[in-house]
């Protein structure tokens, strides 16, 4: 391969993250395209130019911003997935629905859809939510930070599952669901985000995900991992919190 080579990343979110990072650093950068094969990749991970790898059980500690030449979407790949892997990507769909103010894409509109029958519409519609945000803030200096809803806690929970004997190897989506619900509750306590909306989101997600119970020592260990979150500023742990269903801070 040389500097004019093109790397094709065909696979799920982990593969497009690693492949994008490899392309971005090989010979100081070659072009790449992403062809995501999971719902998670199609609506979120393959878009936006964030590339990276985990380091010492910590999420995305090494990486760069570099957008792919193209992201090619084909929902036929979803037919190859187990039901569990298919659903894994739904956490990011719900996140996007909570961040948009477009009436036909809000959470209340999303829950009227059938995840499996309406997958093509869901992929195209909710990936566009992320792409529009990224287009206005490619390097996450301002508005793009809202895409981290659920991820400060979610990434720490996911990292904890790598090292814990009690919470073992959670999928990304399941960890992010825990993060979304918890950060919505923090939004309620801090900014008076409606508690009834927190409950509605939680009850809906319970239809798709097994919400694990965390004990006090688990929570303390997860907090310790949050200290390493890449969004932090000094000793300050940063969250994306909501005032309403269409506004984030």
What are these regions (language model features)?
Residues 243-249:
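Conserved small/polar residues in nucleotide/adenosyl-binding loops
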Residues 90-94, 122-133, 147, 180, ...:
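Short alpha-helical scaffolding segments that buttress acidic/His motifs in well-ordered protein cores
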Residues 170-209:
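Active-site pocket-lining segment
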Residues 115-163:
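Oxyanion-binding "anion nests"
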Residues 1-33:
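N-terminal small/polar loop signature for handling phosphorylated ligands or for N-terminal nucleophile
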């Amino acid at each position: 391969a040389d500097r004019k080579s093109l790397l094709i990343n065909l696979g799920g979110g982990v593969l497009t993250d690693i492949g994008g990072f490899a392309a971005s650093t090989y010979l100081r950068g070659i072009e790449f395209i992403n062809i995501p094969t999971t719902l998670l990749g199609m609506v979120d991970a393959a878009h936006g130019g964030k590339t990276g790898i985990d380091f010492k059980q910590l999420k995305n500690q090494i990486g760069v911003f570099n957008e792919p030449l193209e992201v090619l979407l084909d929902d036929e790949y979803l037919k190859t997935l187990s039901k569990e892997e298919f659903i894994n990507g739904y956490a990011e769909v719900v996140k996007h629905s909570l961040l948009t103010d477009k009436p036909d894409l809000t959470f209340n509109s999303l829950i009227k859809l059938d995840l499996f029958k309406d997958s093509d519409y869901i992929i195209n519609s909710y990936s566009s939510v992320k792409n529009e945000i990224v287009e206005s803030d490619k390097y996450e200096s301002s508005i793009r930070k809202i895409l981290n809803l659920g991820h400060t806690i979610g990434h720490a929970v996911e990292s904890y599952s790598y090292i814990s004997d009690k919470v073992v190897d959670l999928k990304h989506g399941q960890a992010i669901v825990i993060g979304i619900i918890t950060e919505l509750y923090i939004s309620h306590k801090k900014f008076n985000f409606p508690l009834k909306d927190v409950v509605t989101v939680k009850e809906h997600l319970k239809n798709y995900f097994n919400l694990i119970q965390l004990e006090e020592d688990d929570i303390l260990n997860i907090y310790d991992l949050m200290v390493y979150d890449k969004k932090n500023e000094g000793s300050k742990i940063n969250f994306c919190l909501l005032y309403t269903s269409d506004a984030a801070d």
